[in-house]
Amino acid sequence: MRKLILALILGIATANGATAQTRSDLRDSLSAAVQVLAFHPDSLELRMKKAAWNIELEQWRYAQEEYDFVLRCDEKNIAALFYRAYVNERQGRYKFARLDYENLLRIVPGHFEAMLGLALLNQKDNRPTEAFNQINTLVAQHPNNAVAYAARGGIEVERKMYTPAEYDFTRAIELDPKNSDYRLNRANVRLLAGRKKEAREDLDAMVGFGVPRANLIEWYKKCR
């Protein structure tokens, strides 16, 4: 679930100006960015774009180096801090990721994505009390944000807190009724709680929204 929420919130491709492409296309785009950057090595905009392609190709170290350069020139660059935190987390550099999130929050108190990223990072880094306090604060500050509820639900599932997790996924669904990820996660919670009929209802709803039934075959098998 954590990976799902990070993908939803970080929106790496969209936020960095990248679009869905094949790996070959991505490598071509990266190569072009490198060539242009060679003529404009001080361009922070170009370095941010190159880092976007590095992220798309999961070249975490190269992306980090670009964000390092940008932040040496502009230490309050919000986007660079945010994405470097993500890149640091992907490399297992949790201490550095935490510092980036915390620095970002000092610059922009209440920054939604940074607060969420920090809560999920602390959950992953075995800091359960901090993580839960942070995600509860996020939900309290954003009571109409579906992602906040879904993120808390994901943390609760990891802790086997299935009743509150179902509540949070239900709230997320109420706020974003056609989000298939939220419904699938609620179906999972219901299966974990032994409520197969209700889990199947969530799967049926997803099919009704256009998700191919064939994509859910394994989930339907669990509901038998």
Task: Walk through the language-model features, giving the residues of each.
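Terminal, low-structured helical/coil segments at or just beyond the last alpha-helical repeat
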Residues: 24-29, 192-224
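Helix-start (N-cap) detector for alpha-helical repeat units in TPR-like alpha-solenoids
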Residues: 44-45, 78-79, 112-113, 146-147, ...
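Sec-dependent N-terminal signal peptides
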Residues: 4-14
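Position-specific recognition of the canonical hydrophobic site in helix A of tetratricopeptide repeat
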Residues: 55, 82-89, 123, 150, ...
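Boundary of Sec targeting at the N-terminus
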Residues: 18-21
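Structural signature of tandem alpha-helical TPR/SEL1-like repeats
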Residues: 23-32, 57-69, 90-103, 125-137, ...
